[in-house]
């Protein structure tokens, strides 16, 4: 196999699956364990939120450091730190979980940037979007079984079993990760050590100065708000009104993400051009899904479950499309930091899906909250349509 499916890249995708397997378990186990330990929802929220907040803050730093040091060297250091963080889970309580979540957030920022930038730099231009899509696919696969494993461990009421599983994942991921490469020989990164027009702090201002980054970032934030609102509140929504099973809904969504990222990856543009009709078509799926979720009790369970497929398809296509586009149009100098800032937009959006939409649902109810989500997506659909197709600048090559 060639291109994004070549063996060196398949090893990277497998490493991605292994790396995110622990988090798929922890995302469910930590709240359950925290409740058993008598923690309030606020404390549990702080512990869980520390992961994504830390990842969001460190992504631009990660892009800059990777540009100077190289993705392989950074990856190997991060794998060791990640292993230490996972081992902490096996021997501590909630306070240790907080420290480990912060460490995991740092690791995730550097890990995802190392692999995505390494894939972008190593693949030919026509295969970039496919490579990023496959990375996203393998990062999602653990969500198919991780929650079930977490619930099983929690039901067993055996913290030693939890420690064994997490430490096993930590060690196998580290050992496997030390053997992966992006190519026969890691590219020389000395030419990337240039004087940056911004640093890891001032880079945040570039979000508003760079029109391409601003446009793509806003689209990613709004779409991620909907994704976050769905994953956070659909369980409460379905339980409170009793019209469907949230577990079935989220499983269907995860299957749709995995299937779409594999079977539709070749349809994702990878030419450095803006495709308004394509973006409107993809985002329209999310609008329909948001409205169906809002009227879930009225439309029935079957149609409600069908909306999970639309959400999964959108989730699978929006991120790699925008990442691939920005890899072409962003300026070469500082591109890695700017890509890190864009990826942080996805983190921010998902966190806002809970932090922002939670109070809104308290005020107006779940139905209107999801209607508002759909209206927000209509706004970014209009943005996508009005944005003129932009040819790839030669300076971005």
Curated annotation (Swiss-Prot):
<feature type="transmembrane region" description="Helical">
    <location>
        <begin position="363"/>
        <end position="383"/>
    </location>
</feature>
<feature type="transmembrane region" description="Helical">
    <location>
        <begin position="217"/>
        <end position="237"/>
    </location>
</feature>
<feature type="transmembrane region" description="Helical">
    <location>
        <begin position="285"/>
        <end position="305"/>
    </location>
</feature>
<feature type="transmembrane region" description="Helical">
    <location>
        <begin position="309"/>
        <end position="329"/>
    </location>
</feature>
<dbReference type="InterPro" id="IPR020846">
    <property type="entry name" value="MFS_dom"/>
</dbReference>
<dbReference type="GO" id="GO:0005886">
    <property type="term" value="C:plasma membrane"/>
</dbReference>
<comment type="similarity">
    <text>Belongs to the major facilitator superfamily.</text>
</comment>
<comment type="function">
    <text>Involved in the export of the metallophore staphylopine.</text>
</comment>
<keyword id="KW-0472">Membrane</keyword>
<dbReference type="GO" id="GO:0022857">
    <property type="term" value="F:transmembrane transporter activity"/>
</dbReference>
<keyword id="KW-1003">Cell membrane</keyword>
<keyword id="KW-0813">Transport</keyword>
<feature type="transmembrane region" description="Helical">
    <location>
        <begin position="77"/>
        <end position="97"/>
    </location>
</feature>
<feature type="transmembrane region" description="Helical">
    <location>
        <begin position="38"/>
        <end position="58"/>
    </location>
</feature>
<feature type="transmembrane region" description="Helical">
    <location>
        <begin position="337"/>
        <end position="357"/>
    </location>
</feature>
<feature type="transmembrane region" description="Helical">
    <location>
        <begin position="102"/>
        <end position="122"/>
    </location>
</feature>
<dbReference type="InterPro" id="IPR052714">
    <property type="entry name" value="MFS_Exporter"/>
</dbReference>
<feature type="transmembrane region" description="Helical">
    <location>
        <begin position="158"/>
        <end position="178"/>
    </location>
</feature>
<dbReference type="Pfam" id="PF07690">
    <property type="entry name" value="MFS_1"/>
</dbReference>
<protein>
    <recommendedName>
        <fullName>Staphylopine export protein</fullName>
    </recommendedName>
</protein>
<dbReference type="InterPro" id="IPR036259">
    <property type="entry name" value="MFS_trans_sf"/>
</dbReference>
<feature type="transmembrane region" description="Helical">
    <location>
        <begin position="239"/>
        <end position="259"/>
    </location>
</feature>
<keyword id="KW-0812">Transmembrane</keyword>
<dbReference type="InterPro" id="IPR011701">
    <property type="entry name" value="MFS"/>
</dbReference>
<feature type="transmembrane region" description="Helical">
    <location>
        <begin position="12"/>
        <end position="32"/>
    </location>
</feature>
<feature type="transmembrane region" description="Helical">
    <location>
        <begin position="134"/>
        <end position="154"/>
    </location>
</feature>
<keyword id="KW-1133">Transmembrane helix</keyword>
